[in-house]
Amino acid sequence: MKLKFDLKKKNGNARRGQLTFERGTVQTPAFMPVGTYGTVKGMTPEEVKETGAEILLGNTFHLWLRPGQEVMKMHGDLHDFMNWQGPILTDSGGFQVFSLGDIRKITEEGVHFRNPVNGDKIFMDAEKSMEIQKDLGSDIVMIFDECTPYPATHAEAKKSMEMSLRWAQRSRDHFDKLENPNNLFGIVQGGVYEDLRDVSVKGLTEIGFDGYAVGGLAVGEPKEDMHRVLEHTCPQLPEDKPRYLMGVGKPEDLVEGVRRGIDMFDCVMPTRNARNGHLFVTGGVIKIRNATHKTDTTPLDPHCDCYTCKNYSKSYLHHLDRCNEILGARLNTIHNLRYYQRLMESIRKAIDEDRFEQFVEEFYARRNREVPPLGKQA
């Protein structure tokens, strides 16, 4: 079904809303854990839900290569395959193709590349991406686009953005031809160039989508550039449609995204960092493998209500990490995912109570950091 987006409240640029799908509701601003291969690494769907997650991100490119469309269709769709009955957003595969580097060739038609799993020559285009995502049963389908690399000259970024716009139209046309009852999001490109972002927004809104993502950020550009692009782009996006900042990011990035009008985020950071022993807490980050934690019998974060913090000490988590025990990665992941969801809950509450900027000040004060400057207000 078509999603319903209710924008309930604004506090400055920060937006408080709700996404309603056939499979459930999602409170925004929202963070989506990443389940690349149909699993949030090391977690059962029940455990992910327990952390407060209401929507997951799946990866079109990787699920197409393994297990493939036929296996997916045998189960029904990705929801049935992985036993997650909440909403799922799938990225189109564009970013993964971008990440392949030398083993891919991008043309107007699409992307030729070698399968990183077995070396086979394969081809992906906008139409194929729409077909795969329909088979996945994605509640939110992303258009096929090219992620503009950083750094890129204005001419390079313009050429890439214009091709992404043509691919956006092809994605829209094929999505409609397939009679997909779900939702299609456009992706704004244009690198760090505001004039190119303007052209991209205009082109995408003329085509018309159910939501709009800001892509091509967090690919190596300075934070100031990311903030500037968001400040410039977000006010131009339709007020009544959800806004999604792709692949971002650190807790600070989520706060800064919300300050500039973003509703949805995804990132591998909480799960990947958990497996590397980098754990997010109220005051910043704890590196659990550091020797100082060997004899620390206190929980990771006294403010955290997750299963890990309620039951285990830093000393135990340090021990598991040093011994490379699988349980260590699992407990760390539970904690980091819950940290991210608690952060989003706090953000939503602050917007509800008209004190979001006060929340921002307190957030940075706990980290002993200055609040980054905020540019023009919408």
Swiss-Prot record:
Record-listed substrate binding positions: D91, S92, G93, G94, F95, D145, Q189, G216
Involved pathway(s): tRNA modification; tRNA-queuosine biosynthesis
Cofactor: Zn(2+)
Region spans: RNA binding: 247-253, 271-275
Cofactor binding remark: Binds 1 zinc ion per subunit.
TM regions (residue ranges): none
Entry's Gene Ontology molecular function annotations: metal ion binding; tRNA-guanosine(34) queuine transglycosylase activity
Residues in the signal sequence: none
Cross-referenced SUPFAM superfamilies: tRNA-guanine transglycosylase
Gene3D superfamilies: Queuine tRNA-ribosyltransferase-like
Catalytic residue list: D91, D266
InterPro entries attached to this UniProt entry: ArchSynthase1/Queuine_TRR, TGT, TGT-like_sf, tRNA_ribo_trans-like
GO cellular component, one term: cytosol
Swiss-Prot/TrEMBL GO biological process terms: queuosine biosynthetic process; tRNA wobble guanine modification; tRNA-guanine transglycosylation
Keyword set includes Transferase: yes
Residues annotated to bind Zn(2+): C304, C306, C309, H335
Top-level taxon of the source organism: Bacteria
Coiled-coil ranges per UniProt: none
Reaction equation(s) it catalyzes: 7-aminomethyl-7-carbaguanine + guanosine(34) in tRNA = 7-aminomethyl-7-carbaguanosine(34) in tRNA + guanine
Quaternary organization: Homodimer. Within each dimer, one monomer is responsible for RNA recognition and catalysis, while the other monomer binds to the replacement base PreQ1.
Cited function: Catalyzes the base-exchange of a guanine (G) residue with the queuine precursor 7-aminomethyl-7-deazaguanine (PreQ1) at position 34 (anticodon wobble position) in tRNAs with GU(N) anticodons (tRNA-Asp, -Asn, -His and -Tyr). Catalysis occurs through a double-displacement mechanism. The nucleophile active site attacks the C1' of nucleotide 34 to detach the guanine base from the RNA, forming a covalent enzyme-RNA intermediate. The proton acceptor active site deprotonates the incoming PreQ1, allowing a nucleophilic attack on the C1' of the ribose to form the product.
Family indicated by similarity: Belongs to the queuine tRNA-ribosyltransferase family.
Protein name: Queuine tRNA-ribosyltransferase
Organism: Vibrio vulnificus (strain YJ016)
